[in-house]
Amino acid sequence: MPVVKGGVWTNIEDEILKASVSKYGLNQWARVSSLLARKTPKQCKARWNEWLDPSIKKIEWSKEEDEKLLHLAKLMPTQWRTIAPIVGRTANQCLERYQRLLDEAEQREASALGLTGPDGGEAHAPSADDVRKLRPGEVDPDPETKPARPDTIDLDEDEKEMLSEARARLANTQGKKAKRKARERQQEESRRLAALQKRRELKTAGINIKVTTKKQGQMDYNADIPFEKKPVPGFYDTTEEMSRNEYQRAHFDPKKQQVGNKRKGEEDERDGKRRKGDKDPSVQAALKAGQLQKMREAEQSSKRRALVLPAPQVGEGELEEIVKMGMIGERANMLARESDNDATRGLINNYSTLNTNAPIRTPMAPAQEDHIANEIRNIRALTETQSSLLGGENTPLHQGVGSTGFESVAPRKQVMSTPNPLATPLRAAGAGPGATPLRVGQTPLRTPRDTFALNDAGDEMSMVGGTPRDVKMREMSIRHQLKQGLASLPKPKETEWELELPDDQQEPKTAEQLEEDAAERDRREREIREARELLERKRRTQVMQRDLPRPVQVDYQSLLKEASQAEDPVKVLIAREAALLVAHDATKYPLPGAQPTGRALEIQKIDDAALQEAKLQVLMEIKDKPKPEEVQAVWEKSNSSSLLLGLGCYEDDEEEEQISTMQIALEEVIDQIVASAEKGNKLEKKLNLHLGGYKNRAEMLRKKISEAHEALEKANNALGAFKVLQSSEQAAIRNRLAALREEVGFVSTREREAQELYRRTREELDALTLNGPKANGFR
């Protein structure tokens, strides 16, 4: 019984087709179809070109692709094989998307007109998807463009035979062709090694030859780097990378790494044993999905870059200088306003407040038209209109800006470039729409605090984009106007003036008291404070000056009692003074973390001169330093014994006692570590409980700020594009109006001439009719 080839593709057939294409290529479809008992070569080729080809895009259609599809469908109707490579989809995908767009547009219009019918799903009219669905008994005409049918649990005998034959043929590596390929690979490897050996010998002999074994369109993996992306030439700051590397190197612990690798190996071994025990296909699918999710997360984390913020434009020093300049200017204004000279007061005005009468507002981006809907209306209007042979008006179509934006195969794109000052409307003194406003309004282009009207509208503002020649010509014209104005002044009257100089009066001299600069005052006060601190530090004890350790708790009474037991009265005084100093330092200057009890004892303040005299007397009473030979002899004597100091008392201890002591110490350390870990966990939970909401709020605000910034950038780009488009459209409108006026004038002239010709011809005809001969009583 012959087998009817065709029908729905199965998953097994798809896998066999992909494996056979990888072996036989894209030209031997007869050999590929020999592995599939139910498919023809034409069906195999169609299946590969319409579904299995990795270059086929199966993602959602973008707006640009829809616009390009509709425009090309208008230019080349029903030529889907030609449209498909331009759009980047298959012909069947283009046709289905085109029909779906038309159906969606028709459905929107029907819903807008209220053509929904009565309520209830059974009473509604069938949709486009319902109409295209296959009815029971119908055969899909294009099964190559549909997803594969899942494999059944129990395969047919024909499918099992086909699968086994395909496995055997695709796994054949001992045939003539496989042996020839292996032999060719071996010969290629031997040639490569021979060339390498020859090149090495020539290099040792001082001869360098260039390797030219690279083929066109291929890569030499021995010389080139796969997927290499060379950085842009230039200088880069690697300080952050070096600091990050040093930080990682300092915090790297090889022991932790070894323990982590060991634990990871143990966990992988346990997971492998557990996977072997799980035979459920759903469990296997879940594990595979989890692995894919981990891979995607790893890719996302590797793609994520560190946040690089720009350096501040103004530093702290510059801010301080700006503040000082403002204070100096304000002080000068105050002095000028307090002066008795009217001329000085007239030249000073208030420049401290801003003109906030015209606040700057963020412009709203204009609403955009639905280009896809307009193009669909054009297509429907062209398909549903009657023939042009019947006459009537043409169907109105959306063209120009309201269409898809395609003038050819590629869309229109406004290229943002630096404006040319000779071509932009900046030099036209604000003429024309889209020009930069040259007067003070919503966008102030001059100083908002111009009290003396120094910046006139149309003065320098109109020369923003002017060339140096234009600026020079304008200066010359202003100078000429000034000369003309001075020349037009009336001549002064001839009057004799007598000036009497007032008597010189000696003004009382007042001592000018200049206010000291804040920085100089701060520096002087800081030096005085540092000198006082240094002097106070020198008055302290040597223990405090050298920052030596001090006792946490001091029993002053016990120290006094011990000092009183000495026989020498001088030593008693010295011991009492030492006890007083120790107690004073421990109480007044405690160690960090210590909590002294009681109040610091008062010590007698000694004059600096008396203190220096006492130090001098002490130095005179101190014995001379020992000679280096004596110190060396004592050192050799103390280090001649190999026994460490303090270990003599441990010679008789038993080994078991030492082990027990060390075990007790180890247990105490472990208990302390566990207690510290528990305390840290509690603190971490407490902080997460108190600060979790703030962290989430900060993350949400950060995302909103980034989204708002992106939206603002897009709106600014759109605004600039539409401004450029508006200026170009205004220029084109004038040209088109002039051309239309010329055409209308030409048509009017021709019509007038034709009317004149018709009038003369009519008059001649009437004259001939009146003056002509009569025949049978009729003219």
UniProtKB/Swiss-Prot annotation:
Query: Which Gene Ontology BP annotations are present?
Result: mRNA cis splicing, via spliceosome; mRNA splicing, via spliceosome
Q: What is this protein called?
A: Pre-mRNA-splicing factor cef-1
Keyword Cell membrane recorded = no
Pfam families for the chain: Myb_Cef (PF11831), Myb_DNA-bind_6 (PF13921)
Subcellular localization(s) per the UniProt record: Cytoplasm; Nucleus
Residue runs in coiled coils: 157-204, 653-772
- List, alphabetically, the Gene3D superfamilies matched: Homeodomain-like
Gene that this polypeptide is encoded by: cef-1
Instruction: Output compositional bias ranges, type Basic and acidic residues.
Output: 127-152, 246-256, 263-281
- DNA-binding region(s), chain positions: 29-52, 80-102
Which SMART domains does UniProt cross-reference here?
A: SANT
Tell me, what is one Gene Ontology molecular-function annotation carried by this entry? DNA binding
Describe the task this protein carries out: Involved in pre-mRNA splicing and cell cycle control.
Which superkingdom is the protein from?
A: Eukaryota
Q: Could you say which protein family the record assigns here?
A: Belongs to the CEF1 family.
- Record's keyword annotation contains Glycoprotein: no
Q: What cellular-component terms does GO give this entry?
A: cytosol; nucleolar peripheral inclusion body; post-mRNA release spliceosomal complex; Prp19 complex; spliceosomal complex
List every stretch annotated Disordered.
113-192, 246-284, 424-448, 497-525
